[in-house]
Amino acid sequence: MLKIVSGDIIENAQKYDVEAIVNPNNKYMDYGCGVCGAIYDAAGIEQIETYCHNKWIKDMEVNEIRITPGFYLQKEIIHIYAPIFSQEKNPIEKLKECYLKLFEKLIEEKYNSVIIPSLATGFHRL
């Protein structure tokens, strides 16, 4: 079942009791602005950054997905580095690929309920 809602992503994650939340992250997996910042604030900035920097040495590639614990958020966090409009030759195709990879990962990991914000529409300007 698909349900489309608007509002605060953190409040909705609690309200709808989802298993995971998708984080449109930056390639460094550092605290960011917008949705990424809200997720890091809810999860615990120090906890999540320490976990990410200890687990992965390399920066994320466009459309790469990494999964972490949610710490204080108590939901798994599915990080995806979406395309940045100004850095892509064909940004719309890259964005389609981004969503496709995300849905494939959700099926692979057997998630039943996930909050997904609009990807690449804030800082990434798609």
Features from the language model and the residues they span:
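Phosphate/ribose-phosphate-bearing ligand recognition and processing surfaces
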Residues: 83-126
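Short, basic/glycine-rich phosphate-binding loops at helix/coil junctions
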Residues: 72-86
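N-terminal short beta-loop-beta anion/metal-coordinating cradle
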Residues: 50-75
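Extreme N-terminal starter segment of soluble prokaryotic enzymes
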Residues: 1-4
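Conserved acidic residues
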Residues: 18-19, 75, 112
